[in-house]
C-alpha cells in the first residue's frame, strides 16, 4: 500500500505517502514525510513535525532527529541520530556521523566514524576514523582511528586534509588545513603541509 507501519506508536500523526516504518516509535511524528524507510526502535523519529524525504534509517535511533533532511542513509544504532536538515549523507556503523545536524555529502563507514562531525564533504572509512572532527570540511580519513589520538592530539577543525593509516596524522596540527599524512600514529612514510610541500618520514 501507500504506507506500511508496524510497531507501538509507529508513525504517529503521519499523513505522508510511500513510507515503511517497522519498530516502536519508528517514524513517529513523520507528518508529511514521504518515501522513507525506518527500521528499528526510534528510527527516523523526530520530536516535531517531520517532512523529510527519501531517507533510510536502520537500527535503534538511526536518524532519530530527522526533520527536513533528504537522501540520507543511516545504518547502525544511533547513526546520524542528531541529523535534522542534513542531506545526502551515508553513515554505516554504530554512532557514525552521530552529531551531524545540517551537514551534507558526508560518508562515514565504521563504528563512530565522523562521530562529532557537523560539517560537509568529509569521508571517513574505518572504526573511529575522523571521530573528533567537528567543523572541518573536505577531509579524507582512511584507516582505524585515522586522525584520532586517544587523548588530546586529534584532528578537530582542519579542512582539506588527507590522513591514511591506523592513527595516522598524530603529528599534524589539530586545526590545520591541507595537510597530508600516510603512516601509522605519529610516524609517517609521507607528510605534507599547507604549502603543498611533501617530505619522507
Locations of regions flagged by a protein language model:
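Glycine- and small/polar-enriched repetitive beta-structure motifs of secreted/surface proteins
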Residues: 1-201
